[in-house]
Amino acid sequence: MKFKLLLAGSLVAVGAMALLASNINEKEKQRVELAKAPSEAGIAGKEKSEEWAKYYPRQFDSWKKTKEYDSFTDMLAKDPALVIAWSGYAFSKDYNSPRGHYYALQDNVNSLRTGAPVDAKTGPLPTACWTCKSPDVPRLIEEDGELEYFTGKWAKYGSQIVNVIGCANCHDDKTAELKVRVPHLNRGLQAAGLKTFEESTHQDKRTLVCAQCHVEYYFKKTEWKDAKGADKTAMVVTLPWANGVGKDGNAGVEGMIKYYDEINFSDWTHNISKTPMLKAQHPGFEFWKSGIHGQKGVSCADCHMPYTQEGSVKYSDHQVKENPLDSMDQSCMNCHRESESKLRGIVHQKYERKEFLNKVAFDNIGKAHLETGKAIEAGASDEELKEVRKLIRHGQFKADMAIAAHGNYFHAPEETLRLLAAGSDDAQKARLLLVKILAKHGVMDYIAPDFDTKDKAQKLAKVDIAALAAEKMKFKQTLEQEWKKEAKAKGRANPELYKDVDTINDGKSSWNKK
């Protein structure tokens, strides 16, 4: 009996030792794998994220999962007043909530906003509209020079910008350290009196790499001469932060308005009210910095790229969570002690409050534009409408900044609501002035037409979706195919990696529904 017990104990011990040895060997294998690093020369073809996979396989595999975020909301159908607010501008044609990074480049190509160029010198938008979509952009800035990159039409680089947002946008290919790859961010930080990327802590860098794109910006018209002395004009991405950003819980929107007014800048002239307008981009950084998480030093990556554990390996999840509430155990619950359901309820309440003020603000803004258009029709002069247009310009930018980054209501809920209320207030002040102006010109009972559906709003904005869609499909069948053919021939991207990226014929479009 004693012999049997001794034998059993020995077998258990041997088994445990075998498991321990296996575990040690597996951890050693993982350690060696993690110790792999590119040579001092860096990663050849670093713009292709798959070239990083041999060194960082887990990060690459999680990055590929950005493909899973393939749904979107047609924001113009959800909020038709936006069409009136942006009438005469590309956003009145097509505006969707973002999908995963995997789709960012193709969605840019497919958007009605980028038009239907027929060659490298045609189309409505400048090259700057590629800037936040691909690691090929910093490559082109390095190869061609910053001013040359920002000179010309969007279609100029159609066959060159083919790799979607990936490793090389945020990492040094020699060390994998975080790195800013575009020059406008540091210039903006310096203008705001903030530390540059290189001067910042590692924790701050985990937000600043995101701020390369998730910021408010405009295209600064810049005259220059090339090496041959030829005069050229660049449209350079520039951050309007000279009056500060994220101070004392304020995103800096009023400072941006002051900046834009002082340089007499406008993105476009509204085709109904004839107001020189400003279009907010995606100011995620500014609102994060003014909100409680930013003030407490919680980075973008803490919530959107939380650490995950695989065996003995801890790494940052590069799926870039669209909604951290989908993985609360990895993000929220590392700090918060409330239940998941309670936290979800709090976030939902913030969203509902934003939605309410959003509807009120843009209803007033849309009506202010239409009433101004009626005043013009009745004979009101530019001088009579000067204050009205100033209020519309300022009010719409405040409200637009509040919603242009879809997570603002969470990142800085108080600032989001403040700006929506302020924008609505400006629009209402404009409408009160318009009552007097309209009456002066004999219009006593004008009621703005309905714009409660996307179709009604686009008709008022004179947006011909059928014609725009036909032009876009022709572009996709011609010039875009030439781009793809050239990119493939020159080995600029891996067609296999992106074979499913174009979902235009799968109903994943606001204008080409199947």
Curated annotation (Swiss-Prot):
EC id: 1.7.2.2
Quote the cellular component terms of the Gene Ontology held in the record: outer membrane-bounded periplasmic space
Localization terms from the record: Periplasm
Main localization category: periplasm
Q: Which residues are noted in the entry as heme c 1-binding?
A: C129, C132, K133
Which residues hold heme c 2? C167, C170, H171, H318
List of residues binding Ca(2+): E216, Y217, K279, Q281
Which pathway is this protein assigned to?
A: Nitrogen metabolism; nitrate reduction (assimilation)
The UniProt record's further free-text remark is: X-ray crystallographic analysis includes a sulfate ion that is thought to be at the substrate-binding site.
Cite the Pfam families for this sequence: Cytochrom_C552
This chain's protein is named Cytochrome c-552
Quick one: which residues bind heme c 3? H101, C210, C213, H214
List, separated by semicolons, the cofactors it needs. Ca(2+); heme c
Give the signal peptide as a residue range, or say none if absent. 1-21
Q: Where does heme c 5 bind?
A: H293, C332, C335, H336
Quickly give the catalysed reaction: 6 Fe(III)-[cytochrome c] + NH4(+) + 2 H2O = 6 Fe(II)-[cytochrome c] + nitrite + 8 H(+)
Provide the GO MF annotations for this entry: calcium ion binding; heme binding; nitrite reductase (cytochrome, ammonia-forming) activity
What species does this protein belong to? Sulfurospirillum deleyianum
Q: What does this protein do?
A: Catalyzes the reduction of nitrite to ammonia, consuming six electrons in the process. Has very low activity toward hydroxylamine, and even lower activity toward sulfite. Sulfite reductase activity is maximal at neutral pH.
Q: Where along this sequence does the record place binding of substrate?
A: Y217, H282
Q: Which GO terms describe its biological process?
A: anaerobic electron transport chain; nitrate assimilation
Family designation: Belongs to the cytochrome c-552 family.
